[in-house]
Amino acid sequence: MRGLRPGNQVSAASRLLLPAAACALAAALVMGFAQTAATPSAGDIVAADFVDVSSRVGVDFVHQAPHSSRKYLLETMGSGVALFDYDNDGRLDLFLVNGAPFPDFVPKGTIPQKTGPEYWNRLYHQKSDGSFEDVTARAGLEGAGYGMGVAVGDYDNDGNEDLYVTGLGGNHLYHNNGNGTFTDVTAKAGVGGSGWSTSAAWVDLDGDGFLDLVVLRYIVWDWDDVWCGARDNRGYCHPDVFPPISMLVYHNNGDGTFTEEAHQLGLDKPGKALGIAISDYDRDGHPDIFVANDSMLEFLFHNKGNGTFEEQGLEAGVAVDGDGRTFAGMGVDFADYDNDGWPDLIVDDLANQKYALFRNAGDGTFNYDSYVTGLAGVTLLHSGWGVRFFDYDNDGWKDLLVAQGHDLDTIEKTFPDLHYREPPLLLRNLGGKKFVNVGPASGDVFTQRWVGRGLAIGDIDNDGRVDAVITENGGPAHILMNRTATANHWLGIKLVGHKSNRDGIGAVIRVETSKGSQWVTVTTSSSYLSSSDVRAHFGLGADTAAKTVEIRWPSGIVQTLANVAGDRYLRVDEPTAAPNTKPTR
């Protein structure tokens, strides 16, 4: 997030550069980047087809974000979305986080509360005909306070997905009762937290078979905000103005309660955290944590396997961009975009910074590949929030989708080439070497200008083409159904853990086709404030079956399936055999 510092607008916006200089530099950089990446051929531009069906399927959610004259930072940060199957009927349902009202002047220490249905969080149940029904009140998920993010995970291994909702001044854990209702168990579980929480993630950090909870916090902030911007043009303050704060890490005790252990684990380094992604980046069998920090060093916490973590961002080459500069890290995803078996990182940020693509070198370090892949030139003038790798055309290569929009609602006054409202960005992966923008050739959705924030992915209609939901700050949610015409095949995998956590979160799945192997780490986290379909998706290209499906469960058990037919969702139960130490790559 890129706001302003106290003082006049010229000095406050120094990191954004002066308007004329910014335009000249941007043009020069874009031209320079274009020379490093070949112009995509007609064959590279495989157009997608996404259709916004929100209104026709009954989703009328509008995010509530008051816009005050005092420019409280909270009001521009948006909220998240979750795609998950809360009632186990095989169809993805939809949960949307909402804000709360507050006046133009708010006393210090105030926690805004929801005063009516327009401020409720919303749960939409997907019916058999593909439409959605608002079941919020029936489920007991109206919520409280000013909501921000959501994380989905079955923390008690009862087979029902639970919800954790973050916000300002306290968070809420909702236990799924398995009968269409949820119970707020925050106090009993001990996970209420404090401060301004943003993204959260469920992961089994210690391998005991129960999901632990990592909760990011943004900054130390209150309503007695300083004045930032010009005298006649107040703006949202830059995060440099505020002190950092550490995350919260809750160990699952296995009895419905949690113990906060960030300090003991070595995860209490103060940051300005907005996005989280979890993967075993060095393939040592232990989940690691990447934290996207806003305008300071990014964090990569390496799991040492002894119950502690060590922050290795600088050593690994992911703390700064390829020019050695910090950037406004917001959304993040961990995925193997070049199919070499090592999970890579995408971190998006604000305009004039370039989205950061870090390719895993396989030796504990990463290479900054935004330039060589063409990503830098495409994203220089854009501001990204929610972001996910996904294979929209099932060709076996993970593409990129980004929810976009600047944080400053007055940005055009100072920088005419930058925009508060932006189209979503869809980038096609060309064999793990280049990314090309296929949005302009992909229909009306990618011409719309939204104040994009949250983003979740999942196959909403179970047709094998991954869909998406994007939320707007102070605007509607957009359900984007993937109608891309393709002859390619696919395979979806739903894991059911027994020794491992029930969701199989943290498992690494390798699928081999005639073109090689792909790897996916099972997770619901990544992006920004959001939670995606827990099922793993693989594009098989022309193959109608996978030669091999190999699953390394969090327990260490390795399970191998041969000649697995595609074009279906396959449930795989974890076997009870002793762990096999055979590597997955």
Residue ranges, per PLM feature:
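Bacterial N-terminal signal peptides
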Residues: 19-32
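Repeat-based blade/solenoid architectures
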Residues: 59-80, 117, 139-151, 190-201, ...
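Beta-propeller blade termini
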Residues: 78-88, 125, 146-160, 173-175, ...
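Blade-edge beta-strand/turn elements of extracellular beta-propeller
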Residues: 50-53, 131-141, 181-191, 255-267, ...
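Gly/Ser/Thr/Pro-enriched helix-cap/hinge segments flanking short amphipathic alpha-helices
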Residues: 39, 43-49, 57, 67, ...
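Beta-propeller blade signature
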Residues: 119-126, 245-252, 302, 359, ...
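Hydrophobic beta-strand segments that make up the repeating blades of beta-propeller
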Residues: 94-98, 158-167, 213-217, 288-293, ...
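Short, conserved, GDST-rich strand-edge loop motifs in beta-rich repeat architectures
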Residues: 97-116, 217-242, 402-420
